[in-house]
């Protein structure tokens, strides 16, 4: 298994493959453009862009927190993939972000009110994708992973 870390490759490829010139991560025109695309070609473009960072195994981790926004595209691009999603206690997740100084992203993390609203929206979207993807979306509780890593790893 290879770890790509936290990269922007997915957003870059989705933006390019949408056919819509934009500096935004995603907008309605881009979603419409991607809806008409063969997502396997999008998956190939993504893998081609990160190939130099991959190991020999076909399994890799891309851990950018914003990737939950793209679960629908990820599921279509890799129809056989299982997606591991780490879920943390809301208070702990929000406080962890609040006390961290980020250089370029997560501007909402500097206000507890904004963090709370963002987390609620994230949780609604997470539940939506869980209902559609079923067992393809494997949720791992952060706290369980920390306290019993071996059992959680075996479950995966």
Region spans (language model):
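PAPS-dependent sulfotransferase catalytic domain
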Residues: 4, 8-35, 47, 51-155
């Amino acid at each position: 298994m290879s770890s790509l870390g936290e990269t922007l490759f997915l957003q870059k490829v989705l933006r390019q493959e949408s056919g819509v010139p934009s500096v935004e991560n995603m907008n309605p025109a881009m979603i419409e453009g991607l809806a008409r695309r063969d997502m396997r070609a999008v998956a190939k473009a993504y893998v081609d862009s990160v190939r130099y960072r991959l190991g020999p195994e076909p399994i890799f981790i891309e851990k950018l927190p914003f990737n939950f926004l793209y679960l629908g595209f990820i599921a279509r691009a890799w129809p056989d993939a299982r997606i591991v999603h780490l879920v943390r206690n809301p208070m702990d997740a929000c406080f962890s972000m609040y006390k961290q100084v980020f250089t370029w992203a997560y501007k909402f993390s500097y206000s507890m009110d904004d963090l709370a609203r963002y987390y609620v929206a994230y949780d609604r979207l997470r539940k939506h994708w869980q209902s559609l993807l079923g067992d393809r979306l494997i949720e791992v509780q952060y706290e369980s992973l920390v306290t019993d890593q071996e059992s959680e790893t075996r479950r995966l």
